[in-house]
Amino acid sequence: MRVVTRFAPSPTGSLHLGGARTALFNWLFARHHKGKFLLRMEDTDKKRSSDVVVQSIIDDMSWLGLQHDGDIVVQSSRAARHVAVARELVELGRAYRCYCSEDEVNEQKLQSEGTGKYFRHVCPWKHLNSTGDLPNKPYVVRLKSPENTTIEFLDGVYGKISVKSDQIDDMVILRSDGTPTYLLAVVVDDHDMEITHIIRGSDHITNTVKQIVLAEAMSWVSPKFFHIPLIHDENGAKLSKRNRAPGIHEYKEQGFLPEALCNYLLRMGWSYQNKEIVSMQEAIALFSMEDVGVSCSCLDYKKLVFLNHHYMGSKSESEILDLLLPILEEKLGGRISEEKLSRLSLGIKQLVERAKTLTDLAEDSLFYVQDVEININPEAVETIQNSKKFLAELLESMSGIHPDMWKKTHLSSQIKEFSKTRNLAMSDVYHFLRASITGRLQSPNISEVMEILGQEMCINRMLSAQEI
């Protein structure tokens, strides 16, 4: 049997961490077993579904490297097939037309309150559909749920799950306007797409029981189900619309790498010999749903930052520059010259060692690709204003250095000598020198930075800083 998994998001909102992890686990499971990973857009909620959101989900998955196989299945385009299955179930006597109004159903529910029993709608039309004496008014189609039995399935994570049939309502599979419900569409699509394994959040367990009942009514074999524990926030609370994790596109905008985010999501529930850093190629080889635990995972921003720093450090300088350049050009509002790129490439290694995200790196490296006028942060401005006398003296000292001697070793010696003769702490000199040349109080080794920028640029920036 060839493994076929699927990711089936509802295009009513952007791809979030929980959905991305579900997609990742399904993708890894399929790739590990050399199977297929399919993508289906469950857009039956037409009022809230959006083509823009569909494209954003596709873009986010592509950015994460989760490429799907075959064409994307759009659920709403298969409505005729869903309706045909509902009609077949009615003809088989396994579903029926329910003419009860919404008010009548609500009245039944109201009367059952306080009994302590699960509310199960009792439709008077359940056994009358074959008489031919049916009212001429709107109806829904309900599936006849089994009675006096227990529905069981073996979940790949939680083990045996059992639900008594009296806890399952005669679920609506066709609405009064003739459109299929989510539960019907999902079961039909999973069957027709030949899905063999479904990996999704544990909040779907109730739906799974109903879907198994529906599949059995059609004499279909259900896929193997794996329900993974939900993701909670840093404090262990459930994520909600108000208390949600950022969408995948937000993590991208914050400067996180897709490799880091995938590694982060992988470790939310799955583990192998306590390995923290697992590349996607490694994950494909190692991935097994047997290694997924039953405990909920909590967001851990520090871990994500740690992973991102690792993956940034593992990239070549040219790869980092390719990622960094669009961010810098957007910040500066134009193309960056070859001369400035050359400066940046000489200093990028030291910058990467310090940066946590690409956005951090872009901010930290601006001084390499700017001209004399640079962005100077408030702390650096204050440092410059408090050190103008010494800055002027240091400027005079730096101006007297022969261009051939503008090397980091000689510059370090000059700075050391300057601090000694002025009875200044080296750290203080580095502070106001760094502030005037980079616009920041933190940077890589300032002597190395000065060598890369060149004497003329450094002198001009120090002159400009005196005007603050």
From Swiss-Prot:
It comes from the Bacteria. ATP binds at residue 241. Its EC number is 6.1.1.17. Pfam families: Anticodon_2, tRNA-synt_1c. Keywords: Aminoacyl-tRNA synthetase, ATP-binding, Cytoplasm, Ligase, Nucleotide-binding, Protein biosynthesis. One of its GO terms (biological process) is glutamyl-tRNA aminoacylation. It is found in: Cytoplasm. One of its GO terms (cellular component) is cytosol. Belongs to the class-I aminoacyl-tRNA synthetase family. Glutamate--tRNA ligase type 1 subfamily. It catalyses: tRNA(Glu) + L-glutamate + ATP = L-glutamyl-tRNA(Glu) + AMP + diphosphate. A motif ('HIGH' region) lies at residues 9-19. GO terms for molecular function: ATP binding; glutamate-tRNA ligase activity; tRNA binding; zinc ion binding. A motif ('KMSKS' region) lies at residues 238-242. Monomer. This is Glutamate--tRNA ligase 2. The lineage of its organism: Bacteria, Pseudomonadati, Pseudomonadota, Alphaproteobacteria, Rickettsiales. Catalyzes the attachment of glutamate to tRNA(Glu) in a two-step reaction: glutamate is first activated by ATP to form Glu-AMP and then transferred to the acceptor end of tRNA(Glu).
